[in-house]
Amino acid sequence: MKHAQKPRLVKTKWGFYQYDPMPSDEELYDYYAHKYYQTGQGSYSPEYLNEEIAYFQLKANLIYIKASQLSNIQPGAKLIDIGCGEGWIMDEFYKRGLSVSGLDFSKHGIEKFHPHLLTFFDQGNIFEKIQKTLSDGILFDVVILANVIEHVKEPVLLLEEIKKCMGPCALLIIVAPNDFSALHQILIEKKIIPRKFWLCYPDHLSYFNRNSMINLLSDFGYSILATVADNPIDLNLFNENSNYIKDPSKGKNTHLFRVRMDNFLADINIEKLLTIYETLGAMGVGRNLTYYCSIEK
């Protein structure tokens, strides 16, 4: 992706970072519609081990459990998954009886892993699809935005548009990488890692940590009901034997450690595992953070 001017990181007034200038809409559409899932970019892979699939299903289950604790989610409630990817979260709520809709640039991921959801899937530009939803007057009880906000050129506009399609008691669930975190600062300051590995243009265009995300959401009229972490895989970087940034060959085994650890702990008690990750989320520790939000009354 070529630009006349090299993109640079700019800190916003809310504390999160964005690239400037941004890639064009055409470049991004081509990237996501034709390259992202098919070539295994980001966290996506053309194939997964059975234990990895169990891990993805577990993460979706944890999101459902927490959402049901915070909101009276009934069968038949309307859910929209904006940027539904391979469909793991969408499928979890579908199995619970919700009326689901999914949007994404590409159908490749959902077609491969959850083809039964294609009936509820709409492919194209997510901003255009949200506008169509608004023009149809549809309001949702649950809105999922999982690992999407970091990819879009206008995250602020996206949050404004989402708010318009939320019902009065709706729940917005945002999953985002926890970047420029306190842990990342220490890893860089102590030279434990040689580079800011989380920077990945044009895949991620904005970078949030707990504080900056809460600043942004609060400023646009959202109440943050809970912040929940996922596995803090970055803590492995403190150990030279599992420093997958210095030695990328250690990455696969470290990832599988995360997968097996979470699957094992969930088998013992999934509710207690959720409690662990709620504690870490409150501390701002975790590779991803999940924000459960409602509209301020």
Where are these regions (language model features)?
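Conserved helix-to-beta-strand junction in the class I
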Residues: 164-168
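S-adenosyl-L-methionine-dependent methyltransferase catalytic module, highlighting the catalytic core
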Residues: 145, 153-161, 171-292
